[in-house]
Curated annotation (Swiss-Prot):
Disulfide cross-links: none
Name of the coding gene: serS
Keyword tags: Aminoacyl-tRNA synthetase, ATP-binding, Cytoplasm, Ligase, Nucleotide-binding, Protein biosynthesis
Pfam families per the UniProt record, alphabetical: Seryl_tRNA_N (PF02403), tRNA-synt_2b (PF00587)
Record PROSITE patterns: AA_TRNA_LIGASE_II (PS50862)
Record-given protein name: Serine--tRNA ligase
Pathway linked to the protein: Aminoacyl-tRNA biosynthesis; selenocysteinyl-tRNA(Sec) biosynthesis; L-seryl-tRNA(Sec) from L-serine and tRNA(Sec): step 1/1
EC number(s) per entry: 6.1.1.11
Subunit architecture: Homodimer. The tRNA molecule binds across the dimer.
Organism (species): Salinibacter ruber (strain DSM 13855 / M31)
Length: 428
């Protein structure tokens, strides 16, 4: 959530952010300022009327003691009318504040000055490409064929049991999932993250705290009867762990890692891009979250990015780092990098991680603050998160990039202690 003072003092900057991100209309800023002016005028008038009412009320007792009952009754009648006006003005202020809060939640975060201005994914900047793309002397099979051949994933039965995009993992496919879970969590713990097991459902306040509401409301599954949302990412419960709290300076920085299933409706996803494990409604992910003082957040972003990239390095997967342009950023992000792995059979890049700095945007919504000194005024923290990493496309890349002429798949050495096997297929 943006600070209202920013909207009041620099509306042009906020409008530019709306245009740059392609989210909402700049007219929203004007509407918000009009409501803000109405609210402030009503507050001023309310204070004036209350002050006058208090002055008159003090006169009533004196007039009665002096036997001036008629004058006292006239003032009582007048203060009664003033009370009606006070109640009306209070309602006006409350209505304006409610509408103001509703509208300010629709304003996206302002991009950091270092973010390139652009309309869509074509304007993202490739900052680095790491690793060598595999070369084959045969036609590599896509991961969905390999998974079917080796009985690793069953999408058809998943569709029968739940619906499209809800896979079963079988045998070595299930063991590979579990191996990735432990591999990613162990690496995060070694890098100073505190492991956490978080709730898989959140309430609307938590979804609002991290910005999923109202921006991604339509992309989340919902359980209306109990007022819950199955989490679209563990960012939501982990960041809200400190919602409505004031931390001490010594408590920062905080680093958390957690594994969770995630659920996303992914409305409007069709075609070849969604085949196999490319896009699912239920998937597994390890999430990395950092909560830091404001002056440390961009150093923390670099460190978080390195944490995610190091896992890809360890898996020997070729990948590239993208700095996302304004038009391809999310609603809540001030700056974001995407990490994409190379898919050898599909011959395209697959996103496996977004690493983001939200600055104070989420902290203001969730009221996560800290004190530099015990008696100091609380200040907002900065929040960051990144996937470390999302499993499905990692599995897709591992299968496609490491397939052998005999149809088997050789797994990277870093996973062998976790899987208990080095190869899938060819009767390893």
């Amino acid at each position: 959530m943006l600070d209202l003072d920013t909207v009041r003092n620099d509306p042009r900057r906020v409008k530019e952010a709306l245009r740059a991100k392609g989210i909402g209309s700049p007219d929203l800023v004007d509407t918000l300022l009009e409501i803000d002016e109405t609210r402030r005028s009503a507050i001023t008038e309310l204070q004036d009327v209350q002050s006058r009412q208090n002055e008159l009320s003090q006169q009533i007792g004196a007039l009665k003691r002096e036997g001036k009952d008629e004058e006292a009754e006239a003032i009582i009648e007048k203060t009664g009318r003033m009370k009606e006006k006070i109640n009306r003005l209070k309602e006006e202020v409350q209505e304006a504040e409610a509408r103001q809060e509703e509208l300010v939640l629709e304003l996206p975060n302002i991009p950091h000055p270092s973010v390139p201005v652009g309309a869509d994914e074509d304007d993202n900047e490739v900052e680095a490409t790491v690793g060598e793309m595999p070369a084959f002397d045969f036609d590599p099979a896509p991961h969905w064929e390999l998974a079917d051949r080796h009985n690793l994933v069953d999408l058809e039965r998943g569709a029968k049991v739940a619906g499209s995009g809800f896979p079963f993992y079988l045998g070595k496919g299930a063991r590979l999932q579990r191996a990735l879970l432990n591999f990613f969590l162990d690496r995060a713990r070694e890098r100073g993250y505190t492991e956490m097991q978080a709730p898989l459902f959140v309430n609307p306040e938590s979804a609002k705290g991290t910005g999923q509401i109202p921006d991604k409301d339509a992309l989340m599954y919902e359980i209306p009867r109990d007022d819950f949302y199955p989490i679209p990412t563990a960012e939501v419960p982990v960041t809200n762990f400190h919602r409505d709290e004031i931390l001490a300076a010594d408590d920062l920085p905080r680093r958390y890692c957690t594994y969770s299933p995630c659920w996303r409706r992914e409305a409007g996803s069709y075609g070849s891009d969604v085949r196999g494990l490319n896009r699912l409604h239920q998937f597994d992910k390890v999430e990395l979250v950092r909560i830091v003082p404001p002056d440390e957040s961009y150093r923390a972003l670099d460190a978080l990015l390195e944490d995610a990239e190091s896992a890809l390095d360890a898996l020997d997967l070729p990948y590239r780092r993208l700095l996302m342009c304004t038009g391809d950023m999310g609603f809540t992000q001030a700056k974001v990098y995407d990490l994409e792995v190379w898919s050898a059979a599909q011959e395209r890049w697959l996103e496996v991680s977004s690493v983001s700095n939200f600055e104070a945007f989420q902290a203001r919504r969730a009221q996560i603050r800290y004190r530099l000194e015990p008696e100091a005024k609380p200040e907002l923290v900065h929040t960051l998160n990144g996937s470390g990493l999302a499993f499905p496309r990692i599995v897709a890349a591992l299968l496609e990039n490491n397939q052998q002429p005999d149809g088997s798949i050789e797994l990277p050495e870093a996973l062998h202690p976790y899987t208990g096997f080095a190869r899938i297929g060819a009767e390893a």
